[in-house]
Amino acid sequence: MDLLIVGLGNPGSNFFHTRHNVGFGLIDKLVVKHGLSLKKVKNYEYSDFNFENKRIVLIKPLTYMNLSGNIFPSVFARFYMKMTNLLIVVDNVDLPLGKCKLRKVGGTSTHNGLRSISGSLGSTKYSRLYIGVGNNNESSLRDFVLAKFSDSELKRIKNVFNFLSEEILSIDECNFENKIATINSSSF
């Protein structure tokens, strides 16, 4: 199964290492790990390569989180992919820091990036990989997700990226349930 992996985040150096940008962080990890580079077109960056006899396309939307869905008409047309190939990587404040959750389908919850994608696609029937960023419940949710990780939190998140960079490229229809078990039982 070819994979279209879209990591959500906000463009710009001021959002680097923020909780909301863990999707971008995982894409960046995969790019470095596989010696790739990102190419910029219109409203996203991408890298396209082969891994274990399948096509992998990595995407970072440049539309800001709340407009992430705007990229999909051009992405699906350019790469000849469908929703069945799609894996969205996104932050989740309902999961503890370092906990991951892979799902075949799901809702949008309070996540505006997922709402934008579901609105654009007209469906919530796409796979997603949630990366737990915790929630301190002391500040506004917006301020919390746009805040940078502390040094100790960032170390844990980098461990998550290392783990996920080994796991997600080999996801396919035959082993999706096994990957769910492996990824969902992990915690860093």
From Swiss-Prot:
Annotated residues for binding of tRNA: 15, 64, 66, 112
CDD domains: PTH
Keyword terms of this UniProt record: Cytoplasm, Hydrolase, RNA-binding, tRNA-binding
Family membership noted in the UniProt record: Belongs to the PTH family.
Domain of life: Bacteria
Site (Discriminates between blocked and unblocked aminoacyl-tRNA): 10
Database matches in NCBIfam families: pth
GO cellular component: cytoplasm
SS bond partners: none
GO molecular function: peptidyl-tRNA hydrolase activity; tRNA binding
Marked site: Stabilizes the basic form of H active site to accept a proton: 91
Quaternary data: Monomer.
Catalytic residues (positions): 20
Catalytic activity: an N-acyl-L-alpha-aminoacyl-tRNA + H2O = an N-acyl-L-amino acid + a tRNA + H(+)
Protein name from the UniProt record: Peptidyl-tRNA hydrolase
EC numbers on record: 3.1.1.29
Function of the molecule: Hydrolyzes ribosome-free peptidyl-tRNAs (with 1 or more amino acids incorporated), which drop off the ribosome during protein synthesis, or as a result of ribosome stalling. Catalyzes the release of premature peptidyl moieties from peptidyl-tRNA molecules trapped in stalled 50S ribosomal subunits, and thus maintains levels of free tRNAs and 50S ribosomes.
GO biological process terms on file: protein quality control for misfolded or incompletely synthesized proteins; rescue of stalled ribosome
EC class name: hydrolase
